[in-house]
Amino acid sequence: MAAGISLTKPNIGVYTNPNHDLWVADAKPTLEEVKSGSDLKPGQVTVEIRSTGICGSDVHFWHAGCIGPMIVTGDHILGHESAGVVIAVAPDVKTLKPGDRVAIEPNIICNKCEPCLTGRYNGCEAVEFLSTPPVDGLLRRYVNHPAIWCHKIGDMSFEDGALLEPLSVALAGMDRAGVRLGDPVLVAGAGPIGLVTLLCVRAAGATPIVITDIDEGRLRFAKELVPEVRTYRVQTGLSAEENAAGILDALNDGNGSAPDAIRPRVAMECTGVESSVASAIWSVKFGGKVFVIGVGKNEMKVPFMRLSTWEIDLQYQYRYCNTWPKAIRLVKNGVINLKKLVTHRFPLEDAVKAFETAANPKTGAIKVQIMSSEEDIKAASGVNGASN
């Protein structure tokens, strides 16, 4: 550890297990290992985590114990949306130094398989993605991570640095979906990823834009975030085709059935819910695209003949690759402003309360941040105005 850096707080982490318990306890590396550097491997740096966002997948691992084949089988540390400050570097690391502020890209790849060698490392066959069982996550006070996956953020706030991860998810979708200037776009779902995607499609020049959700409060939030967006509240008692008609009405000032009505060229589906995917398919224009960012169940039914006879492309993504430098530029240069997304903040010691807040729809939480100290919370709250 570099001279001049004094650490006193023990390392703690936020755990879940197959019994769906959630608790805060001691974590590796220990404070003594951090101070001595005994646990630091070649190519790694030690980062003091200052801000971590709670992702929907974190809540899902806690409540459901799995996402598809990714199963919690023992005590497991959550979290993969983090930023902090470098406090130690391995002797062979030349790109970072103690004191550097970094955002952590939460994957460790093999650099040997075909996806890695062709630049699509999100498909690495041996990836260790932090917080995905059995690999522990970043909801800790200190963590050792490969320097190559720690991106310098300069004077960007740690909170914005943590939000680069969900922004990367949206940017990966934008790249593959091919949203263009002037495209009519549907964003399905006004959760955190849907709202970040909304910011991205607006910045890309899409117009008009309509966003959907079942929660009127989230739609109001979307309208505050992007005033020009149209909103549609999904009616759970209606069919996918009927909700699509409502989406088109919202996009066309109530005239969605008119012969010259605008249909989305691209639907960015951010929920993974079967009925929402189907509504998106019924909504887009002939030759349009439904791009699914959201994670859903293993199997689902879709209106195949609509896809076929309207030549609609149905496309998906898995995590992200090569997005972090772009995300940093977008935030640093003010093209994307993520600050309003943070609605609640908690210190690491109160992580259980933070998760309960994130998981409860009655709290109105959009993005909940877990921060290293009350001082960091006060500093961030003074800028962004969120509460705990």
Swiss-Prot record:
NAD(+) binds at P192, I193, D213, R218, I293, Q317, Y318, R319. Zn(2+) 2 binds at C110, C113, C116, C124. Induction: Induced by L-arabinose, D-xylose, xylitol, L-arabinitol, and galactitol. The keyword Oxidoreductase applies. Binds 2 Zn(2+) ions per subunit. Its EC number is 1.1.1.12. It comes from the Eukaryota. Keywords: Arabinose catabolism, Carbohydrate metabolism, Metal-binding, NAD, Nucleotide-binding, Oxidoreductase, Zinc. GO terms for molecular function: L-arabinitol 4-dehydrogenase activity; L-iditol 2-dehydrogenase (NAD+) activity; nucleotide binding; zinc ion binding. InterPro entries: ADH-like_C (IPR013149), ADH-like_N (IPR013154), ADH_Zn_CS (IPR002328), GroES-like_sf (IPR011032), NAD(P)-bd_dom_sf (IPR036291), PKS_ER (IPR020843), SDH-like (IPR045306). Optimum pH is 9. Active from pH 7 to pH 11. One of its GO terms (biological process) is L-arabinose catabolic process to xylulose 5-phosphate. Its cofactor is Zn(2+). Pathway: Carbohydrate degradation; L-arabinose degradation via L-arabinitol; D-xylulose 5-phosphate from L-arabinose (fungal route): step 2/5. Transmembrane segments: none annotated. Zn(2+) 1 binds at C55, H80, E81, E165. Belongs to the zinc-containing alcohol dehydrogenase family. Homotetramer. This is L-arabinitol 4-dehydrogenase. It comes from Talaromyces emersonii (Thermophilic fungus).
